[in-house]
Amino acid sequence: MASSSSVLLVVALFAVFLGSAHGIAKVPPGPNITAEYGDKWLDAKSTWYGKPTGAGPKDNGGACGYKNVDKAPFNGMTGCGNTPIFKDGRGCGSCFEIKCTKPESCSGEAVTVTITDDNEEPIAPYHFDLSGHAFGSMAKKGEEQNVRSAGELELQFRRVKCKYPDDTKPTFHVEKASNPNYLAILVKYVDGDGDVVAVDIKEKGKDKWIELKESWGAVWRIDTPDKLTGPFTVRYTTEGGTKSEFEDVIPEGWKADTSYSAK
């Protein structure tokens, strides 16, 4: 029978081995992807999760706070970006063209995905953990499962402007816990840069803009001892510096857990 000291030594050596292996596997993230657009393609690794033809998360949500990403306008063409893509929530809503050329089942044609979630797997400087549907969309027609069977792919990507259908307008979802002293707003369906770096609101009849703070994902909030009175005009600034203003988009008598879209 092995002595207790021998057993402890084996356990310790095994732990060192695992720690070393884990350390070797870690790849530092690349520089943040910014709101710059062009023809240059960058290299990345891609994996997929969830159902083979699904939108990723079981609840069709993700770390950005969006819901129903399996439905229009996202239609399951979504992905989790690693640190330089997700950017602690500031990458939420940004759009990317992605493509793969290997294995042979890859079409080599670019498809567009929207960042709706994050991933922290340190396997490459840039890593997209895609929905099963988005991953399979890089395949030749009829060979989607062959691509998904690869599990992990080398791909090329570039940031592109987001283009939503004409009937999909910027939308502001007032989060569940909101009340006159606490207002949290999720911003989605932003054309152009897609991601938002600042949100302000203004009460009807007042000149002062009230700055909201980042809460999490694509959610912005304000806590105030003074009761807020709707309607609210909302202004957001995208990463590229574009400001957009939506007058009285959140109406008087607004309700929590309700979405309000621009006209």
Swiss-Prot record:
Recorded hits in Gene3D superfamilies, A to Z, give: Expansin, cellulose-binding-like domain, RlpA-like domain
PROSITE patterns attached to this UniProt entry: EXPANSIN_CBD, EXPANSIN_EG45
Q: Which residues form the Expansin-like EG45 domain?
A: 61-167
Q: May I have one GO cellular component term?
A: extracellular region
Q: Give the source's domain of life in one word.
A: Eukaryota
Q: Where is the signal peptide?
A: 1-23
Name this polypeptide is given: Pollen allergen Lol p 1
